[in-house]
A protein has these predicted regions:
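N-terminal small-domain helix-loop-helix segment of the aminotransferase-like
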Residues: 1-48, 55, 104
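Conserved coil-to-alpha-helix start sites within the AMP-binding
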Residues: 49-53, 73-77, 185
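Structural detector of well-ordered beta-strand residues that form the stable sheet scaffold
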Residues: 44, 68, 88, 149, ...
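Active-site pre-lysine segment of PLP-dependent enzymes
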Residues: 99-112, 124-147, 152-187
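Short acidic capping loops at alpha-helix termini that bridge into adjacent secondary structure
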Residues: 39-43, 63-66, 112, 173-174
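Structural element of the ATP-grasp superfamily
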Residues: 30-32, 81, 168
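PLP-dependent aminotransferase-like
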Residues: 59-118, 128-131
Length: 188
């Protein structure tokens, strides 16, 4: 055998097979540990961002819904809601260093808006909104009972760690934080 005895023992005792639909309890506990105030029961593990976005959009939206998407955004975060319901894009202001205007978000809302999608640290600009803007988005969603889906896959890669925002799932009861292992953790 090519493996050292301790490696062979570890491999032979490894559990192989299908796992729980929501992710293994140890994995979910480890993920919950990266958040403040979340329990393993608050975590769903997916094979990747695409699957997470797909499931979230189909769980939260229907043909009678409306979603507001801060653009540009990850392609699936723009196209999946559009395949389900009416959407409105709110563009970041390029000439203002990719600023997000919360008043524009408010104007884009409809009585049947169920979801706002954001992406910070932003891909492709790298923009991180300031805490006051972030809090204003959370407040807007909370006041209207709107879900807030936050693509946070580049969290942890901020050039200035003091600008790191809280994870939406930590601060808002209807907040969904999407993260992956391939960016900040460098895993495939």
């Amino acid at each position: 055998t090519l493996a050292a005895p301790e490696d062979r023992q570890a491999f032979d005792s490894m559990r192989l097979g299908y796992v729980e639909t929501m992710g293994t309890p140890p994995l979910r506990a480890a993920i919950a540990g990266t958040y403040t105030g979340l329990a393993p029961e608050d975590v769903l593990a997916f094979a990747g961002a695409e699957e997470g976005i797909f499931c979230a959009m189909h769980a939260l939206l229907d043909k009678d819904s409306h979603a507001v998407i801060v653009t540009p955004n990850y392609q699936s975060s723009e196209t999946l809601p559009l395949s389900i319901c009416a959407t409105t894009g709110v563009a970041l202001r390029e000439r203002e260093n990719w600023a997000l205007d919360v008043d524009e978000l408010h104007v884009a809302l409809k009585p049947y808006t169920k979801l706002i999608l954001i992406n910070f640290p932003h891909n492709p600009t790298g923009k991180v909104i300031d805490r006051a803007t972030f809090d204003a988005v959370v407040t807007l969603c909370r006041e209207r009972g709107i879900y807030l889906f936050s693509d946070e896959v580049y969290r942890g890669l901020e050039r200035r760690p003091e600008l790191q925002l809280p994870q939406v799932a930590e601060v808002y009861e209807r907040g969904l934080s999407l993260n992956v292992m391939s960016k900040a953790y460098g895993l495939p």
